[in-house]
Amino acid sequence: MVATAWANAREQVSLDPAVTNLNAGSCGPLPRPVFDRVTVRARMAAGPMDFLSRQLPPLLWTARERLAGYLGARPERLAFATNVTGAVNLVASSVQPHLAAGGEILLSDQEYAPMRWCWERVARHQGLVVRTFRLPVQPLGSPDEVVEAATAAMGPRTRLLFFSHVVSSTGLVLPATRLCEEARRRGVLTVVDGAQAPGFTDLDLAALPCDYYAGSGHKWLLAPTGVGFLHFAEDQGGVLRPPQVSWGYRPDGENPSDERNRFGSTDRLRNLECEGTRDLCPWLAVPSAIDFQAGLGHGRVRERMRELAAFTRERLSGWRGLEPVTPAHPGLSGAMTAFRLPPGTDTAGLRHGLWDRFRIDVPVLDRPDGPLLRVSTHFYNTETEVERLAEALKELSK
């Protein structure tokens, strides 16, 4: 697509013209067709019981089928969730009783902090040990190095492997299929944090040999906040036990059905999703989010994102000590580019300066191995916005 076409596509996204938004990795803005779909809430407000009982079920099943098709999954194995945090906590509380004391939970050393805490809590309750494997750092030549680091850390006591498909702080893309294959060969349960993956990379969950995969829609897919999902392997559905007891619960203990029911789900999925009366309208907007990017071409969108990421790397690398930590290898990177900031950087001052003086929304992260600047480039971003960031960094360094 030519620049004019991308500019026209940008016009369809709800962006504040006063803000430079380089932060889809935290939360993406809504395309107007997606926002318009969320206004289905008006129908719920006008007739709540008619909407929830009669109108919602077919809409919910359609949304599930569309998301499943987009992810390469089967709809009966795909539970909606509010976000990845909730989905992973559901998995953790469900598998906890099945993890024998004395075993180990293996994580990468770059996991999102609340997810690490989640597994540390499981370990405390079950008498397990949490171990980490160190992800290789720049220069990182190939995905083989990641696989070697993970497999070297797996041992006879490893019971569960948890890792991010795309590392949230650096944008490093892990070879998820190969990691899950290695774990499966060793009888290790796999749970993948896919918060950054939908819309960021091409997904085929049916071909990914993991036991549980949790993802978000509010980042790169540009779906509303409140859209998450949990995909589970066929032999893992019976393990899942939601913390809440609501409609869908089977007091008789019988295995719930995986056939579509009249509620827009299956008996098993209803048990996982139902929390009493709640607003499911964000889930119903998923088809609109998929359609919007399909209209632009999913492949072309990802190509544009990578093009902007490459421009960002070239424009900012080496300037005043900025060092890219995201690999350049196409199999290990995508649309997020992280830069190591010079030692001693006042991260709070830089963060506030970028926003207060220049209205640039971009994360400045504090990490044990040094501060980072993380730049997310979606199709609606422009080279001019990256230049604006470069000029702001120059001004703030004076």
Swiss-Prot record:
One GO term of the biological process aspect: antibiotic biosynthetic process
The enzyme's E.C. designation: 5.1.1.17
Annotated spans, Disordered: 243-264
Top-rank EC class of the record's enzyme: isomerase
Cofactor: pyridoxal 5'-phosphate
Residues that bear N6-(pyridoxal phosphate)lysine: K219
InterPro entries: Aminotrans_V_dom (IPR000192), Aminotrans_V_PyrdxlP_BS (IPR020578), PyrdxlP-dep_Trfase (IPR015424), PyrdxlP-dep_Trfase_major (IPR015421), PyrdxlP-dep_Trfase_small (IPR015422)
Catalytic activity: isopenicillin N = penicillin N
TM region(s), chain numbering: none
UniProt-recorded Gene Ontology molecular function terms: isopenicillin-N epimerase activity
Pathway in which this enzyme or protein is active: Antibiotic biosynthesis; cephalosporin C biosynthesis
Basic and acidic residues composition-biased segments: 251-264
Keywords, sorted A to Z: Antibiotic biosynthesis, Isomerase, Pyridoxal phosphate
Function field: Catalyzes the reversible isomerization between isopenicillin N and penicillin N.
Family classification: Belongs to the class-V pyridoxal-phosphate-dependent aminotransferase family.
Protein name according to UniProt: Isopenicillin N epimerase
Organism of this sequence: Amycolatopsis lactamdurans (Nocardia lactamdurans)
Gene name linked to the record: cefD
